[in-house]
Amino acid sequence: MQIIHHGAVNGVTGSCHQLDVNHHSKHISSYLIDCGLFQGAETAGQSSAEQLQITFDINNIKALIVTHCHIDHVGRIPYLLAAGFNQPIYATTATAALLPLVIEDALKVGVTRDTTLIQACINRLNKLLIAVDYGQWITLPINHGISSPSRLTSTTAGPNTLENPPGYTKAKLKFKPAGHILGSAYVEIDLSGPKASSTSNAKTRAKTSHRVVFSGDLGASYAPLLASPKSPYRADTLVIESTYGDKNHQGRKDRSKQLKNIIEKAVKDNGVVLIPAFSIGRTQELLYEFEHIIYRNKNNPIWQDIDIIVDSPMAANFTQKYRQFKMLWDNEAKRKLAQGRHPLDFNQLTTIDSHQDHLAVINYLDSVNKPAIIIAASGMCTGGRISNYLARFLSKPTTDVLFVGYQAKGTTGRDIQTYGPQGGYVYINELKIDIKATIHTISGYSAHADQHNLINFVKRMHHKPSHIRIVHGDEEAKQALAQEYRKLI
């Protein structure tokens, strides 16, 4: 077998990994894990069309397996379908419910407003989509054949070829909770071949099966709403993300205290707090945290009077899905529900739907001397409604911009993080905007596992992998994590 990476090799976007089984044989079977969009610096030198092209052969791909529905993991799916892909698309039950919404929004924002074309794509997606419960083994389609032996090779972005006699005849898939966003999963693919005879030695028998684990995006420990991921029992080959492979997050109490302090300072300044956030995952975690702070500060007029505005119709749709799948929430969130609390809804919350209302809110906040918290996409400030807020308020000293998620190189969010503290500027909507706002970053709200979590994911396996492929990270993060893994295996 071999693994080929079509994205998330030199950065954190464009996740797309191909597992080839029996690749030395004419009976090759391939499985695609994610098919995401490139963003930020990883699109440099490419036209929009080039960024979206499916440049690899899809003829032998037997299935697409989706780990979760963030755009950097699913954004190229419409182009995969346009290239002729017509095989099963496997996803968890919650991801299968979210995915059509994500793809529809991505097409509207980045491709076309033609509802006929969009609906045709969604119909085709729904026809191929297969929802799978967590923990359920699903048999994958596979061509039967005998492959010739091969030895381990490793390249930076090319195939990783693993020893593979006597040929695999069965492949099965299981999703396990990843704790990243609703429906997110890491993937276990179990490959097996003809059973060895009783006279075969243990080494020969071991080669008749191989388990490959793809981490997708792993959630951070003690993140709100969703339970932390538990390590698989075993992995022979592991492909793992490394977004924060060189960093550890703040503790939950520290990040909550920092969030509270930032908001209270902004209220005293009568300023606007802008929080760029993904519509799926980060927005819901922030609402959960704000409800907790408001509940703990019942007698504090600051928190009883503050306006918290979610300016994103997509976020509102996804929040409804979070409520629908509350059976996937962690025990803490379920206890709050049992107490009659509503972790994703409270009196101070307003949701903005139409574009007209969006513009009206910006004009209103710009004309009054009143504090407010704005949560809007996109999470890396590469577009979406947050851009209009930044264009209007980034140059005001009373504004606070709060980053709670990873900002990829080449994105507006990374530029604001980098140049904001220096009194620099950015271009938004083709306008040069001086940064006079105060810029904050709270690492503890990241939905990605930190270095400690990533180490434990491997350390807690009973059968540790003999091969690890580190992806989805900047070079520094990948190297730092690799150094830690060398101590384990």
Named regions from a protein language model:
Residues 1-65, 70, 74, 79-285, ...:
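His/Asp/Glu-rich metal-coordinating catalytic cores
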Residues 19-22, 189-192, 229-232, 255, ...:
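Short, solvent-exposed amphipathic alpha-helical segments in soluble enzyme
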Residues 43-47, 224-237, 327-334, 407-434:
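Short, compositionally biased "basic patch" segments
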Residues 62, 236, 372, 399, ...:
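Conserved acidic residues
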Residues 76-80, 226-227, 289, 385-392, ...:
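A short acidic, amphipathic alpha-helical/loop segment
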Residues 260-412, 471:
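Hard-cation-handling environments
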Residues 426-457:
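Generic long, charged, amphipathic alpha-helical segments
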Residues 457-485:
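C-terminal structured "cap/appendage" subdomains that terminate the fold
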